[in-house]
């Protein structure tokens, strides 16, 4: 399409009007006038060069890198050139900036412009010049930004510093102004460079290279990646480094002292935490000694094998336990669990233990004391370690006479039993009830506590297995009592209350004691249960009942009991088993310590036919007490 037009016959619709020119180029020139259509004159005004009327091809200017197009002057008389959009004012300013940059020795000569061919039109020329000027300025900004970032990233500083001199565009602009700014940034970035080194120094503090990491001047051959870091560090001792070294030394101190502190406070940690809550000094001393003895004896019993613990205890007969002493010696020799269950244990009060400890300190024996009490004191002392015994003696020495008189009423009872067996008594009272003191509500006949004979109804329970009951709620006390079923030994510290305090105790806590003790009867009344053997018919559907409890159940380790009897089953018609019956044996297989899934697999593996089951059923008296407690 030909954009040329004749001046003699000019069509108003073909002619480019002023409004159209202003529409396509809002900023035409500084005077907002028309661009003359003589290309030679326009080039002479903008570029300051002379035209070539001989029609030579366009040449490239090496000073500013802009090609100049020259046309012959003969064609200007007849035809005018095509309309070319004039260049705005900012374009001429960019050309002037390129000229100034070319004359400046610190400028960036762009070798890419000298090798490119000349574009075909002015539009391509302008876009290329704008791209070259913007790219050169972007390179300068990138290079300056990299130098700024290298001072804050010391780990990557060596890589970036080695890459920058390879490019000619980034190496030259670091003149007076840029180098000054870069050195200033490095000076200000000297302090932040210490921050990334903190985890390295903490990790290497235990190694021999820790001193080299703290002092950069000591290391003779540092790694190449850390050389920029050491250059930015100040030569003198930095306060941040000194603070860091002191922090690492302080962090090492408690780590080295932890085992000794643990060893000193381990045996009596639980009792000491309970003693901080006590208000009365005399009572706190009593609780302190009782808790120390209880926790120390319990820990020693758990550390000893069962045969050794059974062999040490029979030398302390106690009233009703004297006929069983010979059988206890035989059980210790034979190692049978059935005969060792007859050994109920022994008890002694703290006054006897105090006399024995005083005898140890004074290197003499008390001949006036009972022989059985001396044997019981010796048996307890033999269970204690030297550190625990020394601390116990120090506790006893500082007691006054009034407190020493109260030691006669405090007894330490050690019971030997089977795993899972109850202690033979129930508890009453608690911090959440009217009676704040935890007492023995009931001693079950034929139980372990009844056979031993020391624990009586109304005695205050100070601790069980080293766990103090001072200030505990009723449910917490019952939980401690249930936890005592698992070990083969139990250490109970009780105190016999004075007769003056007994009426007040009974009058204030009859209702609370009956309700609280009834909730524990279902767990502790093993002596009142009857054991019977029943025979059931095993069908394809099973024995006709479901199980609950077992080891690892939702409520803890419970015995396997009958949960529900199915309708229409033979067990429902015969009424031989009832819900709540504990299953002891099933077809000659003991069910204690099994999970419900294991017991159910045993039932499914049985052949069809009659099956003998040994169950334990609670007596009527126990059920009535439980019902009264529920109501």
Curated annotation (Swiss-Prot):
Compositional bias of kind Low complexity: 128-144
Residue ranges of domain PDZ in the record: 411-496, 533-618
Record region (Interaction with PPP1R12A, PPP1R12B and PPP1R12C): 405-501
Keywords on record: Chemotaxis, Cytokine, Cytoplasm, Nucleus, Phosphoprotein, Repeat, Secreted, Transcription, Transcription regulation
InterPro entries in the cross-refs: IL-16, IL-16-like, PDZ, PDZ_sf
Entry annotated with the keyword Secreted: yes
Gene Ontology molecular function, alphabetical: CD4 receptor binding; cytokine activity
SMART domains: PDZ (SM00228)
Protein name as it appears in the record: Pro-interleukin-16
Function as written in the Swiss-Prot or TrEMBL entry: Interleukin-16 stimulates a migratory response in CD4+ lymphocytes, monocytes, and eosinophils. Primes CD4+ T-cells for IL-2 and IL-15 responsiveness. Also induces T-lymphocyte expression of interleukin 2 receptor. Ligand for CD4. Pro-interleukin-16 is involved in cell cycle progression in T-cells. Appears to be involved in transcriptional regulation of SKP2 and is probably part of a transcriptional repression complex on the core promoter of the SKP2 gene. May act as a scaffold for GABPB1 (the DNA-binding subunit the GABP transcription factor complex) and HDAC3 thus maintaining transcriptional repression and blocking cell cycle progression in resting T-cells.
UniProt subunit comment: Homotetramer. Pro-interleukin-16 interacts (via PDZ 2 domain) with PPP1R12A, PPP1R12B and PPP1R12C. Pro-interleukin-16 interacts with GRIN2A. Pro-interleukin-16 interacts with GABPB1. Pro-interleukin-16 interacts (via PDZ 3 domain) with HDAC3.
Lineage top rank: taxon: Eukaryota
Gene name for this UniProt entry: IL16
Organism listed in the record: Pan troglodytes
One GO biological process term: chemotaxis
């Amino acid at each position: 399409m030909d954009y040329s037009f004749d001046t003699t016959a000019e069509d108003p619709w073909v002619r480019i009007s002023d409004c159209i020119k202003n529409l396509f180029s809002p900023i035409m020139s500084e005077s907002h006038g028309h661009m003359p259509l003589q290309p030679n004159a326009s080039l002479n005004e903008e570029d300051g060069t002379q035209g070539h009327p001989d029609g030579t091809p366009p040449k490239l200017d090496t000073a500013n890198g802009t090609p100049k197009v020259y046309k012959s002057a003969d064609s200007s008389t007849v035809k005018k050139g095509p309309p070319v959009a004039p260049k705005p004012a900012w374009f001429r300013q960019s050309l002037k900036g390129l000229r100034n940059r070319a004359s400046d020795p610190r400028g960036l000569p762009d070798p890419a412009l000298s090798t490119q061919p000349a574009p075909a039109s002015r539009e391509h020329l302008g876009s290329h010049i704008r791209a070259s000027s913007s790219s050169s300025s972007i390179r300068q900004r990138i290079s300056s930004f990299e130098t700024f970032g290298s001072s804050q990233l010391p780990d990557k500083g060596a890589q970036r510093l080695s890459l920058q001199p390879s490019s000619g565009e980034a190496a030259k602009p670091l003149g007076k102004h840029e180098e000054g700014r870069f050195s200033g940034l490095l000076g200000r970035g000297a302090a932040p460079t210490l921050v990334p080194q903190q985890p390295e120094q903490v990790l290497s503090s235990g190694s021999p290279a820790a001193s080299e990491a703290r002092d950069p001047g000591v290391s003779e051959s540092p790694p190449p990646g850390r050389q920029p870091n050491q250059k930015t560090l100040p030569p003198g001792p930095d306060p941040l480094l000194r603070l860091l070294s002191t922090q690492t030394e302080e962090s090492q101190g408690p780590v080295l002292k932890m085992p000794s502190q643990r060893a000193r406070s381990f045996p009596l940690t639980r009792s000491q935490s309970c003693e901080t809550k006590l208000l009365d000094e005399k009572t706190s001393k009593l609780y302190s000694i009782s808790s120390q003895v209880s926790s120390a004896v319990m820990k020693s019993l758990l550390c000893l094998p069962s045969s050794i613990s059974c062999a040490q205890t029979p030398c302390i007969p106690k009233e009703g336990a004297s006929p069983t002493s010979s059988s206890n010696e035989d059980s210790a020799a034979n190692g049978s669990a059935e005969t060792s269950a007859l050994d109920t244990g022994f008890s002694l009060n703290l006054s006897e233990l105090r006399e024995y400890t005083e005898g140890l300190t004074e290197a003499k024996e008390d001949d006036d004391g009972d022989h059985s009490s001396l044997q019981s004191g010796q048996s307890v002392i033999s269970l204690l370690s030297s550190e625990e015994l020394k601390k116990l003696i120090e506790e006893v020495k500082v007691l006054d006479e009034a407190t020493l008189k109260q030691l006669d009423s405090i007894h330490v009872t050690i019971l030997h039993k089977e795993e899972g067996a109850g202690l033979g008594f129930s508890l009453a009272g608690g911090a959440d009830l009217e009676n704040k003191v935890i007492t023995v509500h009931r001693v079950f006949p034929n139980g372990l506590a009844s056979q031993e004979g020391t624990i009586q109804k109304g005695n205050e329970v100070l601790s069980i297995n080293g766990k103090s009951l001072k200030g505990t709620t009723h449910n917490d006390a019952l939980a401690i009592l249930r936890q005592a079923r698992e070990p083969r030994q139990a250490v109970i510290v009780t105190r016999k209350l004075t007769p003056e305090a007994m009426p007040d105790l009974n009058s204030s806590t009859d209702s609370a004691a009956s309700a609280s003790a009834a909730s524990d009867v279902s767990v502790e009344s093993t002596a009142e249960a009857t054991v019977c053997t029943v025979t059931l018919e095993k069908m394809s559907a099973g024995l006709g009942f479901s199980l609950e409890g077992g080891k690892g159940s939702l409520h803890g380790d419970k015995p396997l009991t009958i949960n529900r009897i199915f309708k229409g089953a033979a067990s429902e018609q015969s009424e031989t088993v009832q819900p709540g019956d504990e299953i002891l044996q099933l077809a000659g297989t003991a069910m204690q310590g099994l999970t419900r899934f294991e017991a159910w697999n045993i039932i499914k593996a049985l052949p069809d036919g009659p099956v003998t089951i040994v169950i334990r059923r609670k007596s009527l008296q126990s059920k009535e007490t439980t019902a009264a407690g529920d109501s």
